[in-house]
A protein has these predicted regions:
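Residues forming the flavin
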Residues: 1-86, 126-262
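Dinucleotide-binding Rossmann-like beta1-alpha1 core, especially the glycine-rich loop
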Residues: 67-121
Length: 262
């Protein structure tokens, strides 16, 4: 049985940044372990993206969903730098000012680990105003966002650099390991996995979308109060490039909010 001060389940954005803060603020004196179902970023290879294969071979675990860096690592590496995109950070931390501080800090961390500095895109204010007016006329809202487009290849390098930084400060990465169950024994958490048991004084569960069902099950077992969040339902609408050209020229990955009657 391996023991830690803090155990983290899931090496996605939440788990990695939590480990980063513990490593930096604890100056390497806090014993941290991260249990991750997938593998290190450079080991994640999706057959769909391999020219010689080009199809899903049902890897277990899926390299897209699982692995160090989280589900977004093998996508385009696009980071939305705004508190109310992807969640309501300002509500969680209590103010817009604090939320912006955290957003800017996160961007600095990505740059520290090798994100190219010339990848930041800030939409032109004048063009944004024009699109906002057009959107308002049809009952929609255009949301301008600072975006950093790191790219897939750079994302893997950034995550690998961050992983190396954490390992040099004593953080253990327990990859290829699935967390199965959690018990609390004598004031310690006991995490049962496919590679044995791990114990810790503190436990952070950050299993991502892939582990959402398991997370709910464990939270209920441990008596953690849950608050359901809104459900995002996506609809794919394909249009000719000319239709979106004006908006795409201002925002690479535009966000438009439309409130319908039903």
């Amino acid at each position: 049985v391996r023991e830690y001060d803090v155990l983290i389940v899931g090496a996605g954005p939440a788990g990695m940044f939590a480990a980063h803060e513990l490593a930096v603020l604890g100056n390497g004196k806090i014993k941290v372990g991260i249990i991750e179902k997938g593998y290190f970023a450079h080991q994640r290879k999706c057959p769909l993206q391999e020219p010689k294969v080009g199809k899903c071979t049902y890897c277990e675990p899926c390299h897209i969903l699982y692995g160090v860096g989280g589900a977004g690592t093998l996508s385009s590496g696009l980071i939305n730098l705004r508190p109310d995109v992807g969640g309501e950070l300002h509500e969680l931390v209590g103010s817009w000012e604090k939320a912006w501080e955290l957003i800017n800090y996160i961007d600095e961390v990505f740059l520290k680990f090798g994100a190219p500095p010339n990848t930041l895109h800030e939409p032109d204010p004048e063009k944004v105003r024009e699109i906002e007016k057009k959107a308002a006329r049809v009952g929609a809202k255009f949301v301008p966002i600072r975006q950093r487009h790191i790219g897939t290849d750079n994302s893997i390098k950034v995550i690998d650099n961050m992983t190396k930084f954490l390992m040099e400060r004593g953080v253990d990465f327990i990859v290829g390991t699935t967390a199965l169950d959690i018990d609390k024994v004598n004031g310690q958490f006991v995490v049962k996995t496919t590679k044995g048991e791990f114990r810790s004084k503190l436990l952070l569960l950050a299993p991502g979308r892939g582990g959402a069902e398991w997370f709910v099950k464990m939270a209920r077992k441990l008596g953690v109060e849950l608050e359901p969040g809104p459900l995002d339902v996506g609809v794919r609408v394909e249009v000719p490039a000319s239709v979106m050209e004006e908006i795409i020229s201002v925002e690479v990955d535009p966000k438009i909010i439309i409130y319908t009657k039903t």
